[in-house]
C-alpha cells in the first residue's frame, strides 16, 4: 500500500509556467505519480520598474490553490517549492510569496540563478544518458541557464537574464513574425551570451542537451514531421523561415507545434538560434529531466548513477521478472554478430548500445502473455518511463521488439527517427538472429557462427553437420531466411 511518507513533491514557480511533480522512489530512481503544469506567464506581469502586477499575482495564486489540494497528502519535509527569475527580479515578490506560503502551507524559496542552474544540471545528470562532458541549456520564461559538467559534477554555471516570455514582450510585442523581429531578438540574445561564451568553451562539452519547453516543442515538431531527433542549426533556421511565412503569431501553424506552446515558441527559437550560433553547437538532444527532478533527487539524497541506461534496464528486468541469463545470452550473441559485420555496415556505438538494450528487454512481453509477446513488448517499452533514453530511442527499441520474430513490418522500422532506416533494418536482422540461435537457453548449445556482410547480403556459416543434427533448428532458420527475403534482406545459410 502506498502511504504518504513515501511521497515527495517538487514545485517550480517559473516565469512562464508553474509546475508540480509528485513522485515516489523506486529502486534508485523516481516513479512519477502526478505532473501538473499551468501557464501563468508571471514574467508578462513584470513592469519596467520590476513591479509584479496584481493580475499576474492572482494568476499565480489561483494555480497554487490547485497544487495545495495535492500537497495535503505529503509530509512537509518532503516538499520543496522554489521560485525562479521573475520572483528574483520583482521588487514586490515578498507580497506574492507570503500569500503563496499561506496557500501551500509550506515555505517558498527564491533561489539564485546559479542555484537554479545547479539543480537543473542535477536533474539532467540523474535522468539523461551519457556520463561524458555535457553542456546543459534551459530556456525559461525570464532567464536562461547554461551549465557545463561531467557526470554529477558541474564545471561552470551561468544564469542569464533572457527568456522566452521576456523576449516575447521585447521583440515580438507587435505579434509580427518578421525577419527583423527575429534579427533583433537573436542579436540581443547573442549580446547577453557573449560575456560567458569563452568560459563555457574553455570547459568544453562532447554532448549538448536542452531541458526547456522550447526544446520539448522542437522535439515534438521533429517527431511529428518524421525528422531525426537531433536539433541542429539548419533545422532551427528552417523552422524560423516557416514562422516568418506565417506572418503573425496568431497565425503560427507548424506541424507538431501545440497551441499551448505556440505563443512563446518564436522567442524561444530566437534565443536557441543565438545559443547555437554563439557557442557553435553541432547538435542538441532533449534532456530527461531538469529543475524539478533535481529538487526531488536532492531530497532523496540519491547518488548519480554513471550509467543511467543500465540502471533503467536492471529496474525493468526486476519489475517484469525478465530472465537476465537469457537476456545476457542474446546480448552476447548480438554483440558477437555486430563485431563480425562492423567493417561492412559501419554501425555507430550508440546504435550498438540500443541493439544491446533491445536484447536485454526482448522477453518483456512474456510478462503479459506468450501469445503476441512481441506486440506486448513493443507496447510496454513504448509507454514505460525509461530514464536515459530519448523519446526517439524508446520508439526504436519498441520497433525492434515488435519485429523480433514473425514477418517483418518494414514500415515501422522506417517510421522511427532515432537512426536511419537502413541502420534500423540492420539492427533488427541481428536481433532476430541472436534470439533465434540463443533459443535453447543454454550457453553450451549456442553454435559457433560466422556472419559476413556485403552491402545488404548476409552469409551465415554454421559448423559442419549442425543443420543435419538439428532438424527443428534448420526449420526455424529456413523460416527466418524466408521472412527476411520477403522484405528483400538476402540471408544465405551455409
Swiss-Prot record:
EC class name: hydrolase
Enzyme Commission code(s) on record: 3.6.1.40
Domain of life, per lineage: Bacteria
InterPro entries listed in its UniProt record: ATPase_NBD (IPR043129), GppA/Ppx_hydrolase (IPR050273), Guo-5TP_3DP_PyrP (IPR023709), Ppx_GppA_C (IPR048950), Ppx_GppA_N (IPR003695), PyroPPase_GppA_Ppx (IPR030673)
Molecular function per GO: guanosine-5'-triphosphate,3'-diphosphate diphosphatase activity
Pfam families: Ppx-GppA, Ppx-GppA_III
Reaction(s) catalysed by this chain's protein: guanosine 3'-diphosphate 5'-triphosphate + H2O = guanosine 3',5'-bis(diphosphate) + phosphate + H(+)
GO terms for biological process, alphabetical: guanosine pentaphosphate catabolic process; guanosine tetraphosphate biosynthetic process; nucleobase-containing small molecule interconversion
Coiled-coil region list: none
Keywords, ordered alphabetically: Hydrolase
Pathway entry: Purine metabolism; ppGpp biosynthesis; ppGpp from GTP: step 2/2
Family per record: Belongs to the GppA/Ppx family. GppA subfamily.
Function summary: Catalyzes the conversion of pppGpp to ppGpp. Guanosine pentaphosphate (pppGpp) is a cytoplasmic signaling molecule which together with ppGpp controls the 'stringent response', an adaptive process that allows bacteria to respond to amino acid starvation, resulting in the coordinated regulation of numerous cellular activities.
Name of the protein in question: Guanosine-5'-triphosphate,3'-diphosphate pyrophosphatase
Organism from which the protein derives: Salmonella arizonae (strain ATCC BAA-731 / CDC346-86 / RSK2980)
Amino acid at each position: 500500500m502506498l502511504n504518504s511518507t513515501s511521497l515527495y513533491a517538487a514545485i517550480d514557480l517559473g516565469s512562464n509556467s508553474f509546475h508540480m511533480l509528485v513522485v515516489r522512489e523506486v529502486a534508485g530512481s523516481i516513479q512519477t505519480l502526478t505532473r501538473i503544469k499551468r501557464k501563468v506567464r508571471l514574467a508578462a506581469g513584470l513592469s519596467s520598474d520590476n513591479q509584479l502586477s496584481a493580475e499576474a499575482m492572482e494568476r499565480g495564486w489561483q494555480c497554487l490553490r490547485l497544487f495545495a489540494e495535492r500537497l495535503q497528502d505529503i509530509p512537509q519535509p518532503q516538499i520543496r517549492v522554489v521560485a525562479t527569475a521573475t520572483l528574483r527580479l520583482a521588487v514586490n515578490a515578498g507580497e506574492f510569496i507570503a500569500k503563496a506560503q499561506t496557500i501551500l502551507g509550506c515555505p517558498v524559496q527564491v533561489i539564485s540563478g546559479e542555484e537554479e542552474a545547479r539543480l537543473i544540471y542535477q536533474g539532467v545528470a540523474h535522468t539523461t544518458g551519457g556520463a561524458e562532458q555535457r553542456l546543459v541549456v534551459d530556456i525559461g520564461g525570464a532567464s536562461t541557464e547554461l551549465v557545463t559538467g561531467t557526470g554529477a559534477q558541474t564545471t561552470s554555471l551561468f544564469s542569464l537574464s533572457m527568456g522566452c516570455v521576456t523576449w516575447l514582450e521585447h521583440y515580438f510585442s507587435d505579434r509580427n513574425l518578421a525577419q527583423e523581429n527575429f534579427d533583433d531578438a537573436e542579436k540581443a540574445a547573442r549580446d547577453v551570451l557573449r560575456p560567458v561564451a569563452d568560459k563555457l568553451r574553455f570547459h568544453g562539452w562532447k554532448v549538448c542537451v536542452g531541458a526547456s519547453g522550447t526544446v520539448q516543442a522542437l522535439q515534438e515538431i521533429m517527431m511529428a514531421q518524421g525528422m531525426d531527433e537531433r536539433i541542429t542549426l539548419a533545422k532551427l533556421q528552417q523552422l524560423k523561415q516557416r514562422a516568418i511565412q506565417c506572418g503573425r503569431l496568431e497565425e503560427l501553424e507548424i506541424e507538431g507545434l501545440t497551441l499551448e506552446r505556440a505563443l512563446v515558441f518564436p522567442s524561444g527559437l530566437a534565443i536557441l538560434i543565438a545559443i547555437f550560433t554563439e557557442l557553435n553547437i553541432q547538435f542538441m538532444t532533449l534532456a530527461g529531466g531538469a529543475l524539478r527532478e533535481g529538487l526531488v533527487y536532492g531530497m532523496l539524497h540519491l547518488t548519480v548513477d554513471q550509467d543511467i541506461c543500465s540502471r533503467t534496464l536492471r529496474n525493468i528486468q526486476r519489475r517484469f521478472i525478465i530472465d537476465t541469463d537469457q537476456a545476457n545470452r542474446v546480448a552476447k550473441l548480438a554483440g558477437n554478430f555486430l563485431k563480425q559485420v562492423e567493417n561492412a555496415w559501419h554501425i555507430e556505438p550508440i546504435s550498438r548500445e540500443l541493439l544491446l538494450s533491445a536484447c536485454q528487454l526482448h522477453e518483456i512481453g512474456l510478462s503479459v502473455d506468450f501469445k503476441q509477446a512481441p506486440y506486448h513488448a513493443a507496447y510496454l517499452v513504448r509507454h514505460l518511463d525509461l530514464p536515459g533514453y530519448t523519446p526517439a530511442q524508446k520508439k526504436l527499441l519498441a520497433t525492434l521488439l515488435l519485429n523480433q520474430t514473425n514477418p517483418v513490418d518494414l514500415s515501422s522500422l522506417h517510421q522511427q527517427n532515432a537512426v536511419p532506416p537502413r541502420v534500423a533494418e540492420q539492427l533488427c536482422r541481428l536481433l532476430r538472429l541472436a534470439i533465434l540461435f540463443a533459443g535453447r537457453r543454454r550457453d553450451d548449445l549456442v553454435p559457433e557462427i560466422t556472419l559476413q556482410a556485403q552491402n545488404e547480403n548476409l552469409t551465415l556459416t554454421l559448423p559442419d553437420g549442425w543443420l543435419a543434427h538439428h532438424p527443428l533448428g534448420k526449420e526455424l532458420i529456413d523460416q527466418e531466411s524466408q521472412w527476411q527475403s520477403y522484405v528483400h534482406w538476402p540471408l544465405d545459410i551455409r
